[in-house]
Design a protein with these regions (language model features):
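Active-site histidine-anchored catalytic micro-motif
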Residues: 4-256, 260-270, 279-282, 286, ...
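Caspase-like cysteine protease fold
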Residues: 271-305
């Protein structure tokens, strides 16, 4: 593991390109998106699913997830996929500090040490960490969402590789106790369908309407499989449709953690529910030569802590 003689800082490599690098302008953008998203709909989140594209494409969608975060949590786990490096497991950062234009975030290395002790986690290089965008794109939103908290908080970022369902279940079991802790919450970084020739994916069911309508229905079938909170359901969906959900492995690990917690709670009803609060596409595909990326925002809640009342779930629309 990395040297502990002095803090290793992960630089904000995408600031100024994927999102605004000027702190005051970035803060204004985040404020506007969060205000447009409105007040929390479903109580304090135990986990959210949030996109990780450039903010001009997905910032307004991501705000629907981040508005659900309560500043009472003291530790935020961030699970992002690996786009550039092939991993056969889950990797942790060598850094102690993550830089953002809005202020630095501190990694909870005590939790890292607990995870390393399971022999299931490896350490990535700083270059691998800085080259990956899926975690970094969540950081400014985290700083903004936690700005009302007066006490310190820490993050636990991890990069989830292309792992099989058995490993997803194993990592879910390890992380379940952290998800159950009321001091913690999880951010799951994922875009949804990447459609088009450049993504080598052009599933189109003509009976569902135009191409963009087919994509939306495809994505919403995926959302419904996630709402089951059963790993087998999500895995079966992916096998049937092959949807290019880049964060499918982080999502699956979260589902596995919830499924484990629910299985341990044998005398009660299911503990957790997930709602999808927003859905968007980067463009509306009309022709087979078009392309688009889909984004969604979701919030996982402990049922006993959830607000009572009707929730508009875009997965059901």
């Amino acid at each position: 593991m990395g040297s502990r003689n002095k803090p290793i800082i992960r630089c904000a490599r995408k600031a100024g390109s994927w999102y605004e690098g000027q702190p005051d302008i970035l803060d204004q953008q985040l404020t506007q998106w969060l205000e447009q998203a409105g007040p929390p709909e479903f109580g304090p989140a135990k986990a959210i699913i949030s996109p990780h594209a450039g903010y001009e494409h997905c910032g307004s969608c991501a705000a629907y997830a981040y508005k659900e975060i309560g500043p009472e949590v003291s530790r935020i786990f961030i699970l992002g996929p690996s786009h550039r490096v092939r991993l056969n497991g889950v990797a942790l950062s060598p850094a102690s500090i993550y830089e953002t234009p809005l202020g630095n975030l501190t990694i909870d290395r005590d939790v890292y040490n607990e995870l390393y002790a399971t022999d299931m986690f490896e350490e990535m290089s700083l270059q691998t960490d800085e080259n990956e965008h899926s975690i970094e794109l969540q950081l400014p939103f985290i700083v903004k969402a936690m700005s009302k908290r007066t006490e310190p908080y820490k993050i636990v970022p991890m990069m989830v590789g292309s792992i099989r369902p058995e490993k997803e279940a194993a990592y879910g079991k390890i992380l379940a106790k952290y998800l159950a802790d009321p001091e913690n919450m999880f951010v799951i970084s994922s875009d949804f369908c990447h459609w088009g020739h450049r993504f080598d994916y052009q599933f189109y069911e003509k009976s569902w309407g135009k191409i963009y309508q087919s994509i939306e229905r495809l994505d919403k079938l995926g959302m419904k499989s996630i709402k089951d909170l059963k790993l087998d359901s999500f895995v079966s969906y992916l096998k049937e449709y092959g949807n290019t959900i880049c964060g499918r492995h982080p999502i699956a690990v979260m589902i596995a953690a919830v499924e484990y917690l629910n299985s341990e709670n044998k005398t009660q009803n299911q503990n957790y529910q997930i709602k999808f609060l927003n859905y968007a596409q980067s463009s509306r595909c009309q022709h087979m030569y078009d392309s688009s990326v889909s984004y969604t925002a979701a919030s996982l809640k402990d049922v006993k802590d959830a607000h009572v009342g009707p929730i508009n779930d875009v997965a059901d629309c």
